[in-house]
Amino acid sequence: MVKLLVAKILCMVGMFFFMLLGSLLPVKIIEMDFEKAHRSKKILSLCNTFGGGVFLATCFNALLPAVREKLKEVLTLAHISTDYPLAETIMLLGFFMTVFLEQLVLTFRKERPAFIDLETFNASSDAGSDSEYESPFMGGPRGHALYAEPHGHSHGLSVQELSRSSPLRLLSLVFALSAHSVFEGLALGLQEEGEKVVSLFVGVAIHETLVAVALGINMARSAMALRDAAKLAVTVSAMIPLGISLGLGIDSAQGMPSSVASVLLQGLAGGTFLFVTFFEILAKELEEKSDRLLKVLFLVLGYTVLAGMVFIKW
């Protein structure tokens, strides 16, 4: 039990610094070199697809079985017997909640992008994409994306433009990313087995670090002051540790209410992972015409690695 607590605390510290460094390093050192940018895009795209496989294994091989097991305990204590797939229903409620949050944010932004994705690395509509519309989380300033072709254009808004035009828009974006991260942290904090904590941490670390890099590149592109960028980065980076802390608090409480809360929150967090996997990662990465088979290989590799880790007892 002590080892599990230590593992979760290390996850809190690790996630905070991974996201903080991912957000701030581009602001400090990145140079607007298009050749370098395109090379980085391929590497980041493969890492993102690998993370998609990690999330698939995390959701279906770790989270869903854990929710089913915990739910069975709760129903037994409450003397309730049912064959209804409650675990799957709770998880889908989390999925729909995440979709609603995305659409709520996009209503304020009045545009079409996905909730949080890495399309910042290829925000122009060109021959490399099957989609008529590109969807950056935050595009570059003056309508040009970081990785846009000379004649390309972006439908996104930069951090700088958002902060100038409407503080509410910038706050809505930070809120969306923060809420998203809190639920990922909750899933970590509520785990009761070491191998599930490790496998979940790997998936969250890969995805959230890449998202942090995307955010950092946009802040660098918009020439945001380092102090302002640091405030934004610290806010977003603190959300996963906050979620882990909430999960630890719920997990340490005894009794039926804490067990019910644990089941509900783990299920809702599982729905968030479903959204991340299919809407943010796979839908965006597999629509690109380049390196499709290589991406599928990395997707399967990510799943295989984490599915194998589920069998390891830590």
UniProtKB/Swiss-Prot annotation:
MF term (GO), any: zinc ion transmembrane transporter activity
Record field: catalytic activity: Zn(2+)(in) = Zn(2+)(out)
Q: Which residues lie on this side of the membrane: Extracellular?
A: 1-3, 64-85, 191-196, 251-262, 314
Q: Which UniProt keywords apply?
A: Cell membrane, Ion transport, Membrane, Phosphoprotein, Transmembrane, Transmembrane helix, Transport, Zinc, Zinc transport
User: Where does the UniProt annotation locate this protein?
Assistant: Cell membrane; Apical cell membrane
- TM annotation in the entry: 4-24, 43-63, 86-106, 170-190, 197-217, 230-250, 263-283, 293-313
Q: Which GO terms describe its biological process?
A: cell morphogenesis; embryonic cranial skeleton morphogenesis; in utero embryonic development; limb development; T cell homeostasis; zinc ion transmembrane transport
Q: What is its main location?
A: membrane
Q: Superkingdom of the source?
A: Eukaryota
Cytoplasmic domain ranges by topology: 25-42, 107-169, 218-229, 284-292
Q: Which residues carry this modification: Phosphoserine?
A: S125, S129
Q: Which GO terms describe its cellular component?
A: apical plasma membrane; hippocampal mossy fiber to CA3 synapse; plasma membrane
Membrane-topology annotation of the record: Multi-pass membrane protein
Which InterPro entries does its entry note? ZIP
Family assignment? Belongs to the ZIP transporter (TC 2.A.5) family.
State what this protein does.
Transporter for the divalent cation Zn(2+). Mediates the influx of Zn(2+) into cells from extracellular space. Controls Zn(2+) accumulation into dentate gyrus granule cells in the hippocampus. Mediates Zn(2+) reuptake from the secreted milk within the alveolar lumen.
Protein name, entry field:
Zinc transporter ZIP3
List the lineage, top down: Eukaryota, Metazoa, Chordata, Craniata, Vertebrata
